[in-house]
């Protein structure tokens, strides 16, 4: 087969992963290189039996040598190819999210959309993008133009694309850190970095420049509705509230009172603004505190003011090497929460790290309940919303765990 790309031959272990559908080829799996390439170039991947396995972006700087983007040897990686990818991603979101939720959702989710390292979130008329793969960074002008054009065809006008490339992991792929509005002749002057969204009937201010991740945690959209359903008449403690999304959904669902806690004063200020915007000052109170210290203090004072506790911490581990330490952190907060809740109380608990596998998270909860002397009655076990699709052959796309329990 006469191919225009450099050819990388990989080990049997790498071949098994590639044939199973995993898009990553690690540097130690490459045994032979035929031809030359530069970082960001398209290369072919072959087995040691000379079987074609896929084509993707190469990067000798990264631990991941190749990120496969196609397994069709007939594909041409021109503008039309990426336009098809974008259209496919948008059509999927339009179908699974519906018209209303499509206005505020994740449009592109990296490997789950065969666009490795690329995240694009939509907040009404603003898109927020993050590029963590050198090759995708090179083709982003085509991707961004396709997004604006396809959304326009759906009747959506985009006023700006904000790049949140201010993350250290970009350096691992040989790219600089920065953030700011993407400039292109197909985009108008973007205006403010603040925008307002409506999720589940609740209004939020989103700061795309300074907010965590891309400005808002879209993946918990439907898990918040599960909390709202249980919150009726409850006294709720929402830990790690960020901008107050779980707290506000609980209040909107009929909670008697909600206390929202975060260690960041900036997050508390944003939560207070969202409380006022939704007219929920009589129900929700936001306070700045370290959740670990707060739970300890409540336990020492034998406080039983809350019959519903929500734990949505940041990722305690971003590496497989620190999972054991992370489990101790997760167990500590869950154990304390279980001890604080009365019999018949409710606990919503989450982990957003894919390194914290579901079986490990469940085992941690089992151990915490045992040590707390309680039993857990599971109401729901959920994952991220479907705009963050899970590919079963790419376990890294399955990262969010959400469990809702009654303590009995």
Question: Language-model segments: what does each one mean?
Answer:
Residues 1-124:
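Non-catalytic accessory regions of SAM-dependent methyltransferases
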Residues 110-121, 141-216:
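Non-catalytic substrate-recognition/targeting regions of SAM-dependent transferases
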Residues 233-242:
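Conserved class I S-adenosyl-L-methionine
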Residues 243-256:
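Conserved SAM-binding loop of SAM-dependent methyltransferases across substrates and taxa
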Residues 257-262:
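Conserved SAM-binding motif I beta-strand of class I
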Residues 266-310:
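S-adenosyl-L-methionine
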Residues 305, 332, 346-408:
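C-terminal catalytic and target-recognition region of SAM-dependent MTase-like enzymes
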Residues 306-336:
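Mobile active-site "lid"/loop adjacent to the S-adenosyl-L-methionine
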């Amino acid at each position: 087969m006469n191919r225009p790309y450099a050819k990388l031959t990989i080990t049997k272990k790498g071949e098994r992963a590639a044939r199973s559908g995993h898009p990553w080829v690690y540097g130690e799996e490459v045994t032979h290189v035929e031809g030359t390439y530069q970082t960001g170039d398209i290369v072919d991947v072959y087995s040691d039996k000379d079987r074609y396995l896929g084509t993707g972006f190469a990067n000798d700087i990264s631990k991941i040598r190749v990120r496969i983007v196609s397994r069709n040897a007939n594909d041409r990686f021109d503008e039309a190819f990426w336009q098809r990818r974008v259209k496919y991603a948008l059509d999927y979101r339009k179908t699974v999210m519906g018209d209303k939720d499509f206005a505020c959702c994740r449009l592109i989710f990296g490997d789950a959309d065969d666009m490795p390292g690329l995240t694009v979130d939509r907040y009404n008329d603003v898109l927020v993008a993050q590029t963590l793969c050198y090759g995708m960074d090179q083709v982003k002008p085509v991707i961004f133009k396709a997004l604006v054009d396809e959304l326009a065809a759906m009747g959506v006008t985009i006023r700006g694309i904000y790049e949140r490339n201010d993350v250290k992991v970009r350096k691992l792929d040989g790219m600089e850190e920065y953030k700011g509005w993407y400039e292109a002749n197909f985009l108008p002057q973007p205006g403010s970095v603040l925008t307002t969204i409506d999720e589940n009937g609740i209004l939020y201010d989103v700061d795309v420049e300074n907010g965590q991740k891309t400005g808002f945690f879209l993946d918990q959209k439907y898990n918040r509705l599960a909390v709202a359903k249980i919150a009726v008449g409850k006294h709720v403690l929402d830990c790690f509230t960020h901008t107050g999304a779980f707290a506000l959904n609980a209040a909107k669902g009929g909670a008697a009172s909600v206390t929202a806690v975060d260690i960041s004063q900036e997050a508390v200020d944003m939560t207070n603004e969202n409380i006022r915007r939704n007219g929920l000052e009589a129900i929700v109170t936001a306070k700045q505190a370290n959740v670990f210290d707060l739970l300890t203090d409540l336990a020492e004072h034998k406080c039983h003011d809350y019959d519903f506790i929500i734990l949505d911490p940041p990722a305690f581990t971003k590496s497989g090497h620190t999972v054991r330490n992370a489990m101790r952190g997760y167990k500590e907060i869950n154990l304390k929460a279980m001890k604080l809740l009365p019999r018949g109380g409710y606990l919503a608990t989450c982990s957003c790290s894919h390194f914290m596998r579901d079986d490990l998270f469940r085992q941690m909860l089992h151990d915490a309940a045992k040590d707390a002397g309680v039993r857990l009655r599971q109401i729901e076990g959920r994952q991220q919303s479907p705009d963050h699709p899970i590919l079963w052959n790419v376990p890294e796309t399955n990262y969010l765990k959400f469990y809702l329990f009654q303590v009995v």
